[in-house]
A protein has these predicted regions:
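Histidine/acidic residue-rich metal-binding segments in metalloenzymes
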Residues: 131-301
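His/Asp/Glu-enriched, well-ordered alpha-helical/loop segment
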Residues: 200-217, 221-226, 294-295, 299-301, ...
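Divalent metal-binding segments
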Residues: 61-70, 89-101, 121-131, 148-159, ...
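A glycine-rich helix N-cap at a beta->alpha junction
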Residues: 109-125
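C-terminal cap of metal-dependent C-N hydrolases
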Residues: 11, 316-319, 370-436
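Divalent metal-coordination and catalytic microenvironments
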Residues: 11, 29, 48, 59, ...
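Histidine-rich, glycine-flanked metal-binding segment
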Residues: 1-54
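Metal-associated gating/positioning segment near the N- to mid-region
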Residues: 49-114
Length: 440
């Protein structure tokens, strides 16, 4: 095809069937040629670079509306684009909660007006709105339903089986779950945190049993109602053993923080900056997460970008908020793990592109395939970099990886043929669009 808008040339292209040296031709925001491409308005030489399909971060909290001093859709997606991310899924625990069509419409409007990447939103599921979820889960811009079984930032708690089952039994789309048992954690808090301000107790308060029990409860209810559940930020070896046996019902997410940091060191070195829910745990749990990545149990790696200001995080535990920023460092940290042989680059792409397609049924994205959106995450696997607080675009302005030297960096973010980021600089703000999904 002649007169292409853009050719990506001389790079190593990660196609669904594997990596190969081939050209990719783009026109009108779509991939139109995969092969020998000539005659374009612009050609980018990608020698020594890996051309990934556009990668997605499927768990972000951008705090808008209601918490704009921590983050906005604009600043959060700026950070995403700088981190090589072409699209984000944002969570419903804002103020007001994303539990009505009106709240969803507001966030979609803000995304179109201000986002630097494409986007979709989780719709919050509660016992109060459960009777409407069959209809509302299919609204444009919705990537799935989200429930919180354990209290976290925001006010979107479904602690009892009755509350969880009300959501599970209404709807067909994927239901993402924050699985921590609120009742067990409340009992733990009375004893473990009594007269203690030690953040190192965070993984004792929110212990293995609280995670495992909630995961077992929600998977049991999902089986009862033939519902697909996506269990988020798994942290324990016990949960992985259980989920490995229940892949017919549940898909699995892990976070870079749980793959990279471990207790007690993280709490000694970072203090409350390492405080997140579920908590960072001991190394034997981390080893189990890596085993689950290796054997295919894990479907998605996402950031759970959950920013708070340094002032908020510098308070006295346990009154400090849980959560760390991570959308800008998600891919760099995973590239460093790939460089160190912890996983292949193909598996990385699977966890951040094909996994999201499988779990969420994303339409025409996340794959270098003809007629799909021309989204690409281009990385230099050999580039070394030192992560700093100063380079973070998030309003929170910090990262738990400040000062960490890594190998592998995103050098270009292309969204629908538009070069949004190149070599650490934002070049162009796209007109962002809601991500589309295949609905049954």
């Amino acid at each position: 095809m002649s007169n292409l808008d853009l050719i990506l040339k001389n790079g190593i292209v990660f196609l669904p069937q594997g990596r190969t040296s081939i050209d990719v031709g783009i026109k009108d925001g779509k991939i139109v040629e995969i092969g020998n491409c000539v005659d374009a308005n612009k050609t980018i030489d990608c020698t020594n670079l890996y051309i990934f399909p556009g990668l997605i971060d499927t768990q972000c909290h951008f705090r808008e509306p209601g918490g704009e001093h921590k983050e906005t859709i604009e600043t959060g997606t700026m950070a995403a684009a700088l981190g090589g991310i072409v699209g984000i899924f944002e969570m419903p625990n804002t103020n007001p909660l994303t539990t009505t069509p009106e709240a969803l419409d507001h966030k979609i409007s803000r995304g179109i007006d201000t986002a630097y990447t494409d986007f979709a939103y989780y719709f919050g599921g509660t016992i109060q709105n459960s009777q409407n979820l069959n209809e509302w889960e299919n609204l444009d811009g919705v990537c799935g339903i989200k429930i919180f079984m354990g209290a976290s930032t925001g006010n979107l708690l479904s602690a009892t089986d009755e509350e969880v089952e009300a959501v599970v039994s209404n709807g067909q789309r994927v239901m993402a779950v924050h699985a921590e048992d609120e009742f067990l954690m409340n009992e733990n808090k009375k004893t473990i945190l009594k007269d203690s301000n030690d953040v190192g107790m965070h993984c004792k308060w929110r212990d293995v049993n609280s995670s495992l029990n909630a995961t077992k409860r929600v998977v049991g209810l999902a089986k009862k109602h033939n519902r697909h559940v996506h269990v988020l930020h798994i942290t324990t070896s016990e949960e992985m053993d259980f989920l490995r046996k229940n892949k017919d019902t549940a898909t699995v997410e892990v976070l870079p923080n749980h793959l990279t940091l471990n207790a007690p060191d993280c709490y000694e070195n970072l203090g409350t900056l390492a405080q997140q829910n579920p908590p960072i745990r001991e190394k034997h749990h981390q080893d189990a997460l890596w085993k689950a990545i290796e054997d295919g149990t894990v479907d998605i790696v996402a950031s759970d970008h959950a920013p708070h200001t340094l002032e908020e995080k510098s308070g006295t535990y346990p009154n400090t908020p849980s959560g760390t920023p991570g959308v800008q460092t998600l891919l760099p940290i995973m590239l460093d793990h790939a460089s160190n042989g912890k996983l292949s680059y193909e598996r990385l792409v699977d966890l951040m592109a094909y996994g999201p397609i499988r779990v969420h049924k994303i339409k025409n994205k996340c794959s270098i395939t003809k007629n799909y959106d021309a989204d690409f995450t281009i990385v230099d696997p050999k580039k070394t970099h030192v992560i700093t607080n100063q380079e973070q675009a998030s309003k929170s302005a910090w990262t738990p990886y400040d000062g960490k030297k890594i190998t592998g960096m995103p050098v270009m973010t292309i969204i629908r043929g538009n070069i949004v980021m190149r070599e650490g600089e934002l070049l162009e703000k796209i007109t962002a669009q809601p991500i589309e999904f295949k609905l049954d």
